[in-house]
Amino acid sequence: MITALAAAKAYANSGAMSVGSIGSIGGSQDKGVDFGDLLKSAMDGATKASKVAEHKIAAQVAGKAELVDVVTAISSAEASLETVMSIRDQVISAYQEIMRMPI
């Protein structure tokens, strides 16, 4: 279940990773973010959040971190993973829809 905090973080991250313009009628094209780069950025963010959570857990086991920090890091990693899974599901759905189109 996605909490309000996770939704707010996802919204903030989507604004930071917004895709530039695809092109304009006049022929001049602005350099936008490549879709592959956008996916790579989302994956890198999820990986980083997971590593931060792992380090917080290890620090808590050693008695060097607060439990609240550990829970916050785990929640952030979970939200990132849910975002990546949602993106993956949407990409698969779009691919399947394209494959169903008649030639």
Curated annotation (Swiss-Prot):
<dbReference type="InterPro" id="IPR001624">
    <property type="entry name" value="FliE"/>
</dbReference>
<keyword id="KW-0975">Bacterial flagellum</keyword>
<dbReference type="GO" id="GO:0003774">
    <property type="term" value="F:cytoskeletal motor activity"/>
</dbReference>
<dbReference type="GO" id="GO:0005198">
    <property type="term" value="F:structural molecule activity"/>
</dbReference>
<dbReference type="GO" id="GO:0009425">
    <property type="term" value="C:bacterial-type flagellum basal body"/>
</dbReference>
<dbReference type="Pfam" id="PF02049">
    <property type="entry name" value="FliE"/>
</dbReference>
<protein>
    <recommendedName>
        <fullName>Flagellar hook-basal body complex protein FliE</fullName>
    </recommendedName>
</protein>
<dbReference type="GO" id="GO:0071973">
    <property type="term" value="P:bacterial-type flagellum-dependent cell motility"/>
</dbReference>
<comment type="similarity">
    <text>Belongs to the FliE family.</text>
</comment>
